[in-house]
Amino acid sequence: MAKRTKKVGIVGKYGTRYGASLRKVVKKQEVSQHSKFFCDFCGKYGMKRKAVGIWSCKGCNKTKAGGAYSLNTGGSVTVRSTIRRLREATEK
């Protein structure tokens, strides 16, 4: 069978509806939410989305709260880097 969605990928299900720019934004979110992420607990790429904001690892069965479409949100990355920077400053 021929591959029908070479350019559009996962958003091919929407056809020509909703406009190209909106489908491009949705594609980024849907690819992110269906991909596997790195698990901080066991070190494997096994974190998958179970529901909105709930992520679980297939390797170690740990469940973690995260973002709606990706495991780490922009705010959580900023907070984590700030905490690490402050921790290193107090250790010196």
Curated annotation (Swiss-Prot):
Positions of C4-type zinc fingers: 39-60
GO molecular function, a single term: zinc ion binding
GO aspect biological process, one term: translation
Gene3D superfamilies recorded: 2.20.25.30
Classification via SUPFAM superfamilies: Zn-binding ribosomal proteins
GO cellular component, one term: ribonucleoprotein complex
This protein's UniProt keywords: Metal-binding, Ribonucleoprotein, Ribosomal protein, Zinc, Zinc-finger
InterPro entries, per the entry: Ribosomal_eL37/eL43, Ribosomal_eL43, Ribosomal_protein_eL43, Ribosomal_zn-bd
Protein family membership: Belongs to the eukaryotic ribosomal protein eL43 family.
Protein name: Large ribosomal subunit protein eL43
Lineage, broadest ranks: Eukaryota, Viridiplantae, Chlorophyta, Mamiellophyceae, Mamiellales
The gene coding this protein: RPL37a
